[in-house]
From Swiss-Prot:
A GO BP entry: DNA recombination
Name of the protein this chain belongs to: Holliday junction branch migration complex subunit RuvB
DNA damage among keywords: yes
Subcellular location, record wording: Cytoplasm
Top-level division of the source organism's lineage: Bacteria
GO terms assigned for molecular function: ATP binding; ATP hydrolysis activity; four-way junction DNA binding; four-way junction helicase activity
Disordered: annotated segments: 1-50
Region Head domain (RuvB-H), annotated ranges: 283-375
Catalyzed chemical reaction(s): ATP + H2O = ADP + phosphate + H(+)
CDD domains: AAA (cd00009)
Oligomeric form and interacting partners: Homohexamer. Forms an RuvA(8)-RuvB(12)-Holliday junction (HJ) complex. HJ DNA is sandwiched between 2 RuvA tetramers; dsDNA enters through RuvA and exits via RuvB. An RuvB hexamer assembles on each DNA strand where it exits the tetramer. Each RuvB hexamer is contacted by two RuvA subunits (via domain III) on 2 adjacent RuvB subunits; this complex drives branch migration. In the full resolvosome a probable DNA-RuvA(4)-RuvB(12)-RuvC(2) complex forms which resolves the HJ.
Length: 375
């Protein structure tokens, strides 16, 4: 299976893309953010990616569904149905697209939606696909409208409708395409338009990983990187990885660096814990910014409730960054609650930071939290 990436546009495209700002200002120095770090995007990850469905760890329901789809497509000698993968970043959507291509014995063409801002960008990709090839579009919710409309007939009828000319002299010739499989990946499925979403025959969600599955992933990566690691060391890294394989592999690399300099030999649980404390990743996977947000909420606002804008101003972050970068994991592990009157730190968050939770009598009742308007 060959992997072809279209993430390196021509100079004109690079200049155009440089003008596009990301929707959220995200910290780039944190080890526990699920977004790919720049060096992870640039460095080939083929050596640690699983190549076959049987080697893909975790996501058992997804593997069962896709295993059936692959077997059925092979038996009919057809291409796979179009697939939409959604879920938080770092859970293996790109890896799954590559696995599908390997299982089907075809090429995988990789691109991102922001790179397809002009019609010729997507047309060039589609006309060069061979029968059965996989076209993977990351961040598909960010497709420009004109590009999305070109995809409609391509996905349904394997046909390109190109308008040439304007006004009464305009004509729309059709170009027949080879059958292909479009795999779209998104972290915001609600941002997709209904016409695009409805054209996917398979829509599957990737879920956060359990510690056991992450431990297996860490051990597998360590073997591929020739890094001696015991069970306790793998578990220590896994439990601080926020349920995300990308973070687990990133933490393993940092622990490997620490061990090479400070503690040569197999990485034990104690070594992994010491290394990750050095990098400000605590046993629950919280980093300094997560703890600062909770500390502000507890120390300055008595644990809440407090409105999003107020909390963002107190922490020096913009509201969108707080809502989309910091809060999801805090909500996932039960350290933060979103209520109509605002954000509330849970008793578990108080105890994790070493504070004594206030007595229930001093708290707003659940009914009050559900009915009071947010300030």
């Amino acid at each position: 299976m060959a992997i072809v990436s279209s993430k390196s546009p021509d100079p004109a495209e690079r200049r155009s893309q440089a003008k596009t700002k990301p929707s959220v200002s995200e910290p780039q120095d944190s080890l526990v953010r699920p977004q790919a770090a720049p060096e992870e995007s640039q460095r080939p990850e083929d050596q640690i990616r699983p190549q076959r469905l049987a080697d893909y760890i975790g996501q058992p329901e997804l593997k069962d569904v896709l295993g059936i789809a692959i077997a059925a497509a092979k038996s009919r000698q057809e291409s796979l149905d179009h697939l939409l993968l959604y879920g938080p970043p770092g859970l293996g959507k790109t890896t799954m697209a590559l696995v599908l291509a390997t299982e089907m014995g075809v090429q995988c063409r990789i691109t991102t939606a922001p790179a397809l801002e002009r019609p010729r960008d997507i047309v060039g990709l589609l006309v060069n696909l061979q029968p059965g090839d996989v076209l993977f579009i990351d961040e598909i919710h960010r497709l420009p409208k004109v590009t999305e409309e070109i995809l409609y007939p391509a996905m349904e009828d394997f046909r390109l409708d190109i308008t040439i000319g304007k006004g009464q002299s305009a004509r729309t010739p059709s170009i027949t395409l080879h059958p292909f499989t479009l795999v779209g990946a998104t972290t915001q499925i609600g941002a997709l338009t209904s016409p695009l979403r409805d054209r996917f025959g398979l829509v599957q969600r990737l879920r956060f990983y359990e510690v056991e599955a992450l431990t297996d992933i860490v051990q597998r990566t360590a073997r591929l990187l020739n890094t001696p690691l015991d069970q306790a060391g793998a578990e220590e890294i896994a439990k601080r990885s926020r349920g995300t394989p990308r973070i687990a592999n990133r933490l393993l690399r940092r622990v490997r660096d620490y061990a090479a300099v400070k503690a040569p030999g197999p990485i034990t649980g104690a070594i992994a814990a010491t290394a990750l404390e050095l990098y400000n990743v605590d046993p629950c996977g919280l980093d300094w910014t997560d703890r600062r947000l909770l500390s502000h909420l507890i120390e300055n606002f008595g644990g809440g409730p407090v409105g999003l804008e107020t909390l963002a101003a107190a922490t020096g972050e913009d509201a969108q960054t707080v809502e989309e970068v910091y809060e999801p994991y805090l909500l996932q592990i039960g350290y933060l609650q979103r209520t109509p009157p605002g954000r509330v730190a849970t008793p578990a968050a108080w105890r994790h930071l070493g504070y004594e939770p206030p007595q229930a009598s001093g708290q707003l009742t659940l009914q009050q939290l559900l009915t009071e308007p947010e300030t």
